[in-house]
């Protein structure tokens, strides 16, 4: 399965713990080492120290719509995009709806292994 990773410098405003991009990449690499069925195609990263940074996030979304990969891996939902509305729109309503899966390591979500209702409930709980 072709997958990509996404990391960013700053989490959502309401999240207190801090993960560096290096720490996010380490967690993703460890997961990939255990899951040989996943083939990392590309790493997207918004490195600007700006809450609104989203150039890589937007490029990942566009590439996903074009089906350049099958799955996105992130260390934490709080580092999955610039804010919850953007993530919900891009991941849940756009990419997931077209068959792109999402693996969120910290929260233990793998949309390959759960029902659509469980995904809906997960995003609802993050609101």
PLM feature spans:
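Short, structured surface patches at the beginning of a domain
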Residues: 1-127
């Amino acid at each position: 399965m072709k997958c990509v990773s996404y990391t960013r410098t700053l989490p959502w405003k309401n999240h207190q713990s801090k993960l560096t991009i290096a720490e996010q990449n380490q967690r993703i690499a460890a997961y990939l080492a255990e899951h040989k069925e996943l083939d990392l195609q590309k790493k997207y990263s918004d490195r600007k120290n700006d809450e609104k940074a989203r150039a890589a996030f937007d490029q990942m979304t566009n590439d996903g719509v074009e089906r350049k990969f099958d799955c996105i891996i992130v260390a934490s939902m709080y580092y999955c995009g610039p804010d919850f509305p953007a993530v919900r729109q891009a991941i849940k309503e756009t990419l997931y709806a077209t068959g792109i899966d999402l693996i969120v390591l910290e929260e233990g979500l793998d949309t390959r292994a759960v029902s659509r209702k469980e995904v809906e409930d997960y995003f609802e709980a993050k609101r």
